[in-house]
Amino acid sequence: MARSVVVSLFVLLALAGLEAIQHAPKIQVYSRHPAENGKPNFLNSYVSGFHPSDIEVDLLKNGKKIEKVEHSDLSFSKDWSFYLLYYTEFTPNEKDEYACRVSHVTFQTPKTVKWDRTM
């Protein structure tokens, strides 16, 4: 009897430990089509591989939050990590800088990844 209680307790603790595993998000920022100045496009930020699911993602233009942004539903992979796609319409030019800023429990401060128009 005591042995089964100990085994049950061990199993419960092991399962509780799975919830505590944290994975930092991978952040990819790219345009839907090759960038051409003055030509409308879509700016995408794919954030993947993170756990837990609580996350804040902002697309930025010249360091300021872009308000009209859409995103996919929160989804998870086979390994139970999460992923999201954030996107917005934009028209690239030579002077504006675009980026994605992500806040997650695995980061001490928000992480910002700039869009590289050559990618």
From Swiss-Prot:
Stated family: Belongs to the beta-2-microglobulin family.
PROSITE patterns reported for this sequence: IG_LIKE, IG_MHC
Tagged with keyword Signal: yes
Subunit-level organization: Heterodimer of an alpha chain and a beta chain. Beta-2-microglobulin is the beta-chain of major histocompatibility complex class I molecules.
Biological function: Component of the class I major histocompatibility complex (MHC). Involved in the presentation of peptide antigens to the immune system.
SUPFAM superfamilies linked to this entry: Immunoglobulin (SSF48726)
Biological process, per Gene Ontology: antigen processing and presentation of peptide antigen via MHC class I; immune response
PANTHER family on file: BETA-2-MICROGLOBULIN, MHC CLASS II-RELATED
Name the UniProt record assigns to this protein: Beta-2-microglobulin
Ranges of residues in domain Ig-like C1-type: 25-114
InterPro entries reported in the protein's UniProt record: B2Microglobulin, Ig-like_dom, Ig-like_dom_sf, Ig-like_fold, Ig/MHC_CS, Ig_C1-set, MHC/Immunoglobulin
Keyword terms, alphabetized: Immunity, Immunoglobulin domain, MHC I, Secreted, Signal
Highest taxon of source: Eukaryota
GO cellular component: extracellular region; MHC class I protein complex
Signal peptide range in chain numbering: 1-20
Keyword Heme attributed: no
Subcellular location per the Swiss-Prot or TrEMBL entry: Secreted
